[in-house]
């Protein structure tokens, strides 16, 4: 859109300048964002009370230093942090690398302890259906018509560390979307799913939520 084009032109102009970046450049970018989006609020109202952003942060009791970002890939050693090589990791954030089984167990343990989990995953494959409220990994490929008439969860392959790594290396698995794991469920066959909240509104079969199969989670978590 217009804002993207404006910022892109400004950033490219700044990058072409030799020497250090002028502080005025940052002021210009901030002024542009303010013009399009409005300035950052200095205070706002919550439950009838006026608070500053810092006051609201402190009231929530969230301590970012107590949270850890996890991933699971074999091109780096397990038990160590590394900067995940995906385009959206603009801040070069480090992730603790753990075996796939440990990653799944950690999410289950967090849910057992009453916590929820921020989840980053590939959502660009045919097994991810927001409209139907599921994210599954069928053992055999489905046609578009078969997806439309699917009335039971199909069999899924067992996902291991090697299969997951293969699709990440080939870029079949991509860094697409962040969601929120809030619970678990089982289907009539006893298969387990994570319940996620998506940010795409509530206009699907289950009010904006989705059931993510364990195999989908193991394969497509970034």
Map each language-model feature to its residues:
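Extracytoplasmic mature domains of secreted/periplasmic and thylakoid-lumen proteins
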Residues: 1-11
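Active-site signature of cysteine proteases
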Residues: 27-33, 37-222
């Amino acid at each position: 859109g217009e804002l993207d084009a404006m910022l892109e032109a400004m950033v490219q102009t700044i990058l072409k300048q030799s020497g250090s970046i002028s502080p005025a450049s940052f002021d210009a970018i901030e002024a542009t964002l303010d013009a399009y989006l409005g300035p950052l609020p200095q205070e706002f109202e919550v439950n009838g009370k006026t608070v500053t952003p810092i006051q609201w942060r402190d009231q929530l009791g969230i301590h970012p230093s107590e949270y850890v970002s996890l991933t699971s890939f074999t091109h780096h050693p397990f038990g160590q942090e590394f900067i995940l090589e995906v385009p959206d990791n603009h801040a070069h954030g480090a992730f603790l690398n753990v075996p796939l089984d440990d990653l799944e167990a950690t999410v289950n343990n967090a849910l057992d302890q009453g916590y929820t989990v921020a989840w980053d995953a590939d959502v660009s494959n045919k097994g991810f259906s927001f409209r139907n409220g599921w994210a599954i990994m069928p053992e055999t490929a489905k046609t578009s018509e078969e997806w439309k008439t699917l009335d039971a969860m199909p069999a899924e392959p067992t996902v291991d560390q090697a299969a997951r790594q293969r699709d990440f290396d080939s870029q079949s698995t991509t860094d697409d979307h962040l969601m929120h794991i809030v619970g678990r469920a089982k289907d009539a066959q006893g298969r387990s799913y994570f319940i996620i909240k998506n940010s795409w509104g509530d206009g699907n079969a289950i009010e904006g939520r989705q059931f993510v199969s364990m195999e989908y989670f193991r394969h497509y978590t970034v």
